[in-house]
Amino acid sequence: MADPAATPKSLSIACVSIKDTFAEAFDMKATRLIVTADDRRWCDESARAMCGFGTSVIACGLEIAVEQTLSPEQTPDGRPGVAILAFGMSGKDLEKQIPRRAGQCVLTCPTTALYGGIPGGREVHPKRVPIGKSLRYFGDGNQISKQIQHLDADGRSRPVRYWRIPVMDGEFVCQHDVGRVDAIGGGNFILVGRTMQSVTIASRAAIDAMRELPGIITPFPGGTTRSGSKVGSKYAALFASTNDSFCPTLREVTPSELPSEANAAIEVVIDGLSFDEIAESMRVGITAACEAGASEGLLSVSAGNYGGKLGRHHFKLHELLADASSASDSGAER
């Protein structure tokens, strides 16, 4: 008689199969920035430029995207703002890349200002990421600084230095430096469907639902990527190449993770400030994808991993989604 414990458990949400696998994620460093401006359009234009070409550390230096839109009541200077999360493989990557993007995309944009925005209660690394410390020299000796006392999350007062750099619309105000924290990159899930339309509908529903969550970004175009990768390549110069097990055109020539009726797959990749924030975003995103995609031909949800060899953070789909599956099943029974 078969051991029930050895039999893989089936799990589904809205009749979409959830594979018994895990997403493998790895350690990163992150910072959170707040861009403000006189109006929403300038703010969004600056953020769009700063986050451009920021999908993957493989070629972009950083993984960076807008985390949240902020009302004037949520920003340091009472103006419209956005919060941006940036992730690098090391603190040095942040120290190199952030001043470049700030100088080219925020300093240049009319009326903007730039501040640090790491949420309270996080353990901040003592070595900080330069902003005004680097950009002040653009003022050619006319820049001035001022220290203002701020209260930390624990109630302690500490001085924060700001720079005022003269520019053609007045002054560019920015913080001297900003904090960085330990973070996680590479949380993910893969949506498998009968058609491209089915995974498009599902992925957009997932991203729309996840957009409201703090502490995470989905840095690829529209929050998704079709070019999921595996570690290694037949070409020595590449350390990553196409994830052939999810490519429908390679089903006959390589071991495939796709069922015979599947013709498309899309991956959602998530970077976050903590394990719990990524886990919650995966729960929310996958649930929304299944509910929106089930009637459109979404077949299953899987995840990308490397056998545990790349990252120490493992997001097991069945553990994350057990409650969502139970709620879905009870809803279907009613």
From Swiss-Prot:
It holds the Pfam family FTR. It is an enzyme of class 2 (transferase). GO terms for biological process: formaldehyde catabolic process; one-carbon metabolic process. It is found in: Cytoplasm. Its EC number is 2.3.1.101. It catalyses: N-formylmethanofuran + 5,6,7,8-tetrahydromethanopterin + H(+) = N(5)-formyl-5,6,7,8-tetrahydromethanopterin + methanofuran. The keyword Acyltransferase applies. It comes from the Bacteria. Keywords: Acyltransferase, Cytoplasm, One-carbon metabolism, Transferase. InterPro entries: ForMFR_H4MPT_ForTrfase, ForMFR_H4MPT_ForTrfase_C, ForMFR_H4MPT_ForTrfase_fd-like, ForMFR_H4MPT_ForTrfase_N. Pathway: One-carbon metabolism; formaldehyde degradation; formate from formaldehyde (H(4)MPT route): step 4/5. Its main location: cytoplasm. One of its GO terms (cellular component) is cytoplasm. GO terms for molecular function: formylmethanofuran-tetrahydromethanopterin N-formyltransferase activity. Homotetramer. Belongs to the FTR family. Catalyzes the transfer of a formyl group from 5-formyl tetrahydromethanopterin (5-formyl-H(4)MPT) to methanofuran (MFR) to produce formylmethanofuran (formyl-MFR) and tetrahydromethanopterin (H(4)MPT). This is Formylmethanofuran--tetrahydromethanopterin formyltransferase. It comes from Rhodopirellula baltica (strain DSM 10527 / NCIMB 13988 / SH1).
